[in-house]
């Protein structure tokens, strides 16, 4: 068996000496300059270019430039072991959201989903607001999965539709209890539905019964009781019936 030792040389390291923007950058300098400054005088790598491309693309997407193009171009100085980075920016047209669409909500009503939106129809399309909307749908607890995609509107170059696809899951819970004490057998039953009839409201029913006591309770919770999003919970029906045991005379 022959064993060979190999020496691998990664070559010299290059330092980023300058970073500049080429093309049309519609974002404020106060937002861009700190990003550029953090890249100077650090070791150059291709991953560094990719990271900055993604940051600029995300920032542009949050301001409505859904189809922005960002390309990093290195200018390498072999003698000085330095690299000047240029980022060529083509923001494209600012993009509007034409429609927000929902698919897969067979039970949950559209308005329950729509009130969670942070991206609005007719407004600039914002990647950040679209993602916030997706997360808020997930947090409702009505869906196994929530996915979103942006679809260019045919015949236009500045409009998109935002399409949310949801997979609903069971939102009801049934429970019960059975016990025995000095007062005899005790039976309990409870039903909780977190998305009653697809309205997003929660309804609960609880029944507890023994030989001497009966307790009935109905609860209701509306997370959007007002148009401003104020919630309200209450128990419109609560009934207790108590029967005292008879003490036999000696």
Regions found by a protein language model. Give the residues of each.
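Gram-negative/organellar outer-membrane beta-barrel architecture
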Residues: 107, 123-242
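Conserved small/polar residues in nucleotide/adenosyl-binding loops
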Residues: 1-5, 240-246
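Periplasmic POTRA and POTRA-like interaction domains that precede
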Residues: 4-47, 72-127, 153-188, 228
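Amphipathic, non-transmembrane alpha-helical segments in extracytoplasmic/periplasmic proteins
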Residues: 48-67, 129-146
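Extended beta-sheet lipid-handling architectures
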Residues: 51, 67-69, 191, 220
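Short beta-strand elements
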Residues: 66-75, 144-152
């Amino acid at each position: 068996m022959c064993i060979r030792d190999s020496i691998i040389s990664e070559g010299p390291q290059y330092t980023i000496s300058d970073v500049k923007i080429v093309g049309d950058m519609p974002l404020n300098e106060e937002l861009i300059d700190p990003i550029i400054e953090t890249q100077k005088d650090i070791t150059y790598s291709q991953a560094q270019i990719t990271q900055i491309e993604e940051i600029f693309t995300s920032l542009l997407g949050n301001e409505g430039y859904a189809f922005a193009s960002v390309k990093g171009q290195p200018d390498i100085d072999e003698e000085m072991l330095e690299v000047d980075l240029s980022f060529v920016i083509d923001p494209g047209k600012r993009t509007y959201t034409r429609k927000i669409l929902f698919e897969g909500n067979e039970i949950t009503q559209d308005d329950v989903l729509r009130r969670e939106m942070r991206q609005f129809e007719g407004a600039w399309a914002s990647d950040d607001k679209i993602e916030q909307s997706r997360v808020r749908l997930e947090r409702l607890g009505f869906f196994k999965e929530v996915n979103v995609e942006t679809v260019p509107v045919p015949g236009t170059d500045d409009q998109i539709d935002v399409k949310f696809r949801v997979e609903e899951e069971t939102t009801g819970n049934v429970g019960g209890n059975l016990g025995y004490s000095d007062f005899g057998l005790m039976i309990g039953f409870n039903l909780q539905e977190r998305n009653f009839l697809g309205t997003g409201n929660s309804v609960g029913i609880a029944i507890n019964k023994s030989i001497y006591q009966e307790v009935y309770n109905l609860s209701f919770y509306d997370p959007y009781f007002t148009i401003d999003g104020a919630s309200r919970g209450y128990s419109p029906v609560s009934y207790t019936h108590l029967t005292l045991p008879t003490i036999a005379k000696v």
